[in-house]
Design a protein with these regions (language model features):
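WD40-repeat beta-propellers
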Residues: 23-26, 69-74, 112-115, 154-159, ...
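Conserved strand-to-loop turn within each blade of WD40 beta-propeller repeats
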Residues: 16-19, 58-62, 66-67, 106-109, ...
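Short loop/turn segments immediately following beta-strands, especially the blade-tip
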Residues: 158-167, 253-262
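A structural motif specific to WD40 beta-propellers
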Residues: 32-35, 80-83, 121-124, 165, ...
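Intrinsically disordered, low-complexity acidic/Ser/Thr/Pro-rich linker and tail segments
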Residues: 1-35, 43-78, 344-355, 375-397
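Terminal intrinsically disordered, low-complexity extensions flanking WD-repeat/beta-propeller proteins
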Residues: 268-272, 279, 305-397
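WD40/WD-repeat beta-propeller blade N-cap
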Residues: 38-44, 85-91, 127-133, 171, ...
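Loop/turn segments within WD40 beta-propeller blades
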Residues: 2-9, 48-53, 94-100, 130, ...
Length: 397
């Protein structure tokens, strides 16, 4: 850990300062900028990579601006001209399934949108939270979508229910929710754990919480001396790294298998990595080691064993809001065989208007606060078959 062949990977970074800053792809070995993609300013959790072939980024919506949001998509083998989508509402955090078939976006209003990537079809939109969405993450098996909001609420949604656009009488897709956090959720991290059934949330309330995703049970809370702004595990999921508002990065040994105490710290004092002068904005992990970004406009590559910075990158055009590690081969502009297909994402439809006979086919769910009790989650025997059939049908498009 902390030692590896970094030549096989490159680092994608972006800022939210202005559209001219764009996206940079850096060589982690030398610090050289390999590619610059113009016209991008993405908020926290607003950048992701689809199947190592496309970069997708939501765009910041400045105060006072008129109109909805924007989501741009770039093919990595021809990254200069983006595919531009303009939903009617600003989109902040993004999440995608591992196969790249489905994309979710969260809005400041608390709505979540679910698109099918291949043809851009909007599959579902619903009021997920009463406050602004801050994080979205799919479970390791893609059966569940997890969302976190500004008021500390964490929700778990059934993808099978969300994808069932024909059953308009079905109950809401919410499996369970929690308001255990007392401040904004800043990170959602799914882990392999036991049967892919655990995830970790971080918050400005100075805690990280481990959850059983099936039952919604809070397994354990880890307290910190200050607010946590970003989380990540190492590749083996043995260590949890939690970035703080003062630039510190706290390191804990993570063992989800020990349900009574999944967070463990070796020694009397927690390990703290110090190298930033501003709040941590993003964390990710590569074969070389931990990568951190901060409001001090620097990105650091760490050897976590020796607790030292291997390399420091300066991003003079603003604080980095997103870090994504991709294979080097994805950024070398090669023509991709059997390239995955993406389309312009459909605009969000207007609400149904009974006076003019317009009916929206999108099922809308109420926010978690409207539910008196969480819905019990039981995995059905048909779940795998439903997902499989959908993936087959989309792959044939």
């Amino acid at each position: 850990m902390g030692k590896g062949n970094g030549s096989d990977e490159v680092l994608v970074v972006c800022s939210d300062r202005n559209m001219g800053t764009g996206i940079a792809i850096w060589d982690m070995e030398t610090g050289d900028r390999i590619v610059h993609i113009p016209t991008c300013a993405s908020p926290l959790h607003g950048l992701l990579c689809l199947r190592d072939q496309f970069l997708v980024a939501s765009q910041v919506n400045k105060h006072g601006s008129v109109g909805g949001g924007a989501i741009f998509t770039w093919a990595l083998n021809k990254p200069q001209q983006p595919l531009r989508s303009y939903p009617l509402e600003a989109i902040g955090p993004l999440g995608c399934t591992k196969d790249g078939l489905f994309l979710a976006g969260g809005s400041p209003s608390g709505n979540v949108y679910l698109w099918e990537v291949a043809d851009g079809r909007l599959l579902k939109t619903w009021r997920a939270h009463s406050k602004s969405l801050k994080c979205l993450s799919f479970s390791k098996d893609d059966y569940l979508l997890i969302s976190g909001s500004e008021d500390g609420v964490v929700c778990v949604w059934s993808m099978v229910s969300l994808l069932d656009t024909e059953n308009f009488e079905s109950s809401c897709s919410l499996l369970h929710y929690s308001s255990e956090h007392t401040s904004s959720v800043t990170g959602l991290l799914t882990t392999s754990g036991i049967a892919n059934s655990t995830f970790i949330s971080s918050s400005l309330d100075a805690t990280c919480k481990a959850w059983d995703v099936v039952s919604g049970r809070l397994i354990q809370t880890q307290d910190y001396p200050l607010g946590i702004t970003a989380i990540v595990t190492d590749l083996a999921e043995q260590l949890l790294f939690a970035g703080g508002v003062d630039g510190s990065i706290f390191v804990s040994v993570l063992d989800i298998g020990l349900l009574e105490d999944p967070f463990a710290v070796a020694g009397d004092e927690p390990v703290v990595l110090k190298g930033h002068n501003g709040s941590i904005t993003a964390l990710t992990f590569s074969s070389v080691g931990l990568i951190s970004a901060s409001e001090d406009c620097t990105v650091c590559l760490w050897d976590v064993i020796s607790k030292v910075i291997i390399r420091r990158f300066s991003h003079h055009k603003g604080a980095v809001t997103n870090l994504v590690v991709i294979p080097r081969s994805a950024s070398n502009h090669r023509r991709v065989s059997n390239q995955f297909r993406v389309s312009v994402l459909n605009k969000c439809p207007q609400p149904a208007n009974s006076s003019n006979g317009i009916l929206t086919l999108l099922h809308t769910c109420s926010s978690p606060e409207d539910h008196q009790a969480p819905v019990d989650f039981k995995r059905t025997n048909s779940l795998d078959q439903q997902i499989f059939e959908m993936e087959v049908s989309f792959s044939l498009i």
